[in-house]
Structures are given as structure tokens and as C-alpha cells.
Amino acid sequence: MSESPGEASALLLGGARLTDGRAVDVRIAGPRIEAVGTAGSLTTSGTRVDLRGYLLLPAPAEPHAHADTALTGAAAGPPSHRPEDVRRRATEAALLQLSHGATAVRAHVRVGGVEGLGPLEGVLAARRSLRGLTELTAVAVPRLLTGVAGADGLAALRDAVDMGAGVIGGSPDLDPDPAGHTEAVLELAAAHGLPVDLHTDGDDPARLARLTAMAGGLRPGVCLGPCAGLSRLPGEEAARTADRLAAAGVTVVCLPQGCCSGARLRGTPPVRLLRAAGVRVVAGSGALRDGANPVGRGDPLEAAYLLASQEGLSPGHAYDAVSGTTRAALGLPGVRVEAGFPAELLAVRGDGLAGALSLAYSRIVVHRGRVVARTSAVREYRDSGAAASAHGLPRQGRTDSGPCGGP
């Protein structure tokens, strides 16, 4: 991986397995898939990567990261919010998420208050340094926006948009006037043509109904999360709330791996109920080793695993919640392993999606037609010589790369 971030040469992914069971070659030219054919049928003048033993998937995306506080859980005392410190942490966090497969990250950043715009400055610097490796979008999240105390927050939010924040965030649960807070966010977003991402626990049906009614129809769209409080509503109330969210076209972002800064409640909303009502549900990581979750991993495949194991989704639906559906919620182009689609891909060692979600150790990540990250794992067992061979003890390792430079 010695190419500069801006370069994209021809690339052939050979012998990969798709979720439908086919073994294929995938030829990539620039940032898009040029051709898909039966394994062994395609050639290239560029680099060939041997993906025998790997499952090839559309790359996931991260809809809810906290870049300004990431990797601060072990800090002695309050974490630094100096731009240079935030830039370093945000860069490290985004690269960790990239190694897991996320080629796009929506990063929430607090603005205003004692920190001012320093954390946003750091995250925007990280975005620039990561260009060509991953797409990092900053969400400016204010605290108060109403009353005398909210004037500074509203000014900071406007300044954040001028600096380059790509999404307008909000925290209506933290404002004495949640409706006024939401109205201020939506007005600013409409004026600039930006999407909205609101932090809410979703445990107050009346408040959520007002918020949903206000947000409905806004383009390019509104996300709400983590909405853990929805799981605490009585069944009929939860069903009515789900119907309102679906009618408004609002996306619910759940965090199955844990909590995040600013959320009072832990847990996951009723994912199957929301999906049955027609709500678009996506899954994110939330806190990444900060005060809210000191053991956060930032791994979208773990989020998918938890949706499958804890929420009863099929492996396919669970993975779509961190990949295709998330990309749609973030306004990103759709990805399929077909000619003409963006070359945003994740190869995971395994022969099926369920196995990949369970034991997704070795991974290869492709962003804009380039291999941008590799993680290789080898599993071995201590044996007693011939007995190991006789019993066929499993070993996970890298396939023979051959002369063409496989993984």
C-alpha cells in the first residue's frame, strides 16, 4: 500500500466469494467496479489481490461516532480539547474504524460552551489528513439553543457551518425548550441545505411526536439516535411512535455496542418493531473508548453481530443496517458488487455472512478503488505432532499469496 492517497490504479480482486455463493473476480478501474466475472476469468495490468477464502461485501459506514472524545477513557483528568489533540485522536479513531471496514464516518462534535470551536477545528483537520483513505463528515452538536443561554450556542452552530461542518446536530433533550431547540436546528439546516442529526433518548412520546412532526419532510433528511428510550414505552405507544417515525421519513440510529456522550439511557430501541413499521434503522458504534464507553470498539461488524444475536435480525438484514441502509441514510451512493458501482468494499475471511459476523478477524478494505487497510489474523493450536494432522485441527491463516501478491 505504497500509493499516495490520491492515486487509484487498476486492481483485480481474485477468487472472492459473494453472499450468494458465487466465486468471482472483480476488476476495479479508478473509484468504480469495472467488471465482475467468474473466478479466474478476468485479467488486469495492475495489482492482483488473491481473495480466495474471503467473503466480499459492500463496505460498511459509521453513522454515529464521537470523534472529539474518542480514545480519552484512560486519560488522567479531563481530556484535552485543544485542536491538535483532538485531531490526533480523531485521526487514530477514524483509522481504527477504517481497519474494521468503515470507509465513511459521520463524526459528532460538540460545539460551543467552554470548548468553543476547538474540537471541530481538530476534527476538520483530521478530515483533511484522511482524504483518500476514508470519508469523515463532521456533525456540529450544540448544547443549548434557546433563551439567553442559547444565544451563544446558536452563534457557535452558525460558525461551525461556516467552518465546514457537513451536518447540523442537536440535543433537544438537554435544552429547557426541546421544541425551540429542534426548530432552530431545522431552520439552520434548511437554510444551508444540510442534513440533521439529533441526539435524543426518545423516552417521551409527546416530545418525540412534536419533534417528528417538525422534522418530517426535511431534505436531505433527519436522523435520530440513539433512541434507547423507545424500548421502554408500552407496546401500543411504541407502535404508534414507530408509525409516526415512518410517516415522517426519519432514520433511527441505534447503538447496540453501548452508550454515547449525552445519552441518559442505555440499550437498543425495538429494532424489529421499527423495521416492521417501515422505519429506516441503522446501527452505529457511538462512544469509542471514552468516558461513556471505555471499551468501545468502533466496529460495524460487531454492531451487526449484536443486531443478529440480540435483536433477532437475520445476518443479511443486520449487515445491511451497517452498510447499505447506513450509506443511504448518510446520503452516500449505494454499493453492490456489480459493474458500475463505487469500489467501496470489505473482504472478510469466511465463507458466509453469519460466519463473517461471528469471526471477522482478517479483513481487507477498499476505498475509492484502492486497498487502504489490511488486518491479518492467524489462529493456531498447540498440538502433539501427528495427532493434530490426524484429527484435522483447524488453522486460520493467510492463503498462499502466490506471485501476484495476495493478502
Provide a role label for each language-model segment.
Residues 15-16, 21, 97, 249-251, ...:
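C-terminal helical cap
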Residues 59-70, 195-203:
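Histidine-centered catalytic micro-motifs
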Residues 195, 216-220, 269-348:
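His/Asp/Glu-enriched, well-ordered alpha-helical/loop segment
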Residues 16, 31, 53, 64, ...:
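Divalent metal-coordination and catalytic microenvironments
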Residues 337-407:
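C-terminal cap of metal-dependent C-N hydrolases
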Residues 54-56, 60-62, 71-108, 114-131, ...:
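Alpha-helical scaffold segments that flank or form the walls of functional sites
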Residues 142, 146-148, 161-266:
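Active-site core of metal-dependent hydrolases
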Residues 1-58:
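Histidine-rich, glycine-flanked metal-binding segment
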